[in-house]
Regions:
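Residue-level marker of conserved, structurally anchoring positions within well-ordered domains
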Residues: 1-140
Length: 140
């Protein structure tokens, strides 16, 4: 699904169909715990093995907690429901999207729509004034 192979390293796809934040790239984790067992089911009913859970992003500023590492997953996926469960509002517009903290009414990050897919580039979030980006804790 990467549209430009040179810039897809930290592209994250936002969608309401994902139940959890997930990636297949172990090198993105700044903190990681191995997990035994567990699978995720994709839209085509294929299953992916959960290898572990952890934190991805910048160590001191922008990060996402409770991201699953799924064996063989080719894309980085952000769950809209997980974002909302953490007290955020996700707003989709024709060419962009915004995630805002509802209590502080502060934009956490801005994404863009390219070829009908909303994405954010985690590596550029610090340029948008992002301080912290977290997800809910799951029992895995």
């Amino acid at each position: 699904m990467c549209l430009e192979s040179t810039t897809c390293k930290e592209k994250w796809f936002l969608d309401s169909g994902y139940s959890r934040h997930m990636t297949g790239k172990a090198n993105l984790f700044t903190h990681f715990e191995m997990k035994k067992g567990g699978k995720v089911t994709f839209g085509n009913n294929a299953k992916g093995k959960i290898v572990g859970i952890g934190q991805v992003g910048k160590k001191d500023s922008t990060y996402i907690k409770n991201v699953l590492l799924v064996d063989g997953l080719k894309h980085n996926l952000l769950s809209v429901s997980q974002l909302c469960d953490k007290g955020n509002r996700v707003t989709f517009k024709p060419k962009e999207c915004f995630v805002s903290h509802m209590e502080e009414n502060k934009v956490i990050f801005k994404g863009e729509r390219v070829n009908n897919v909303y994405t954010i580039d985690l590596s550029s979030l610090t340029n948008q004034g992002v301080e912290c980006f977290v997800a809910i804790k799951d029992d895995y």
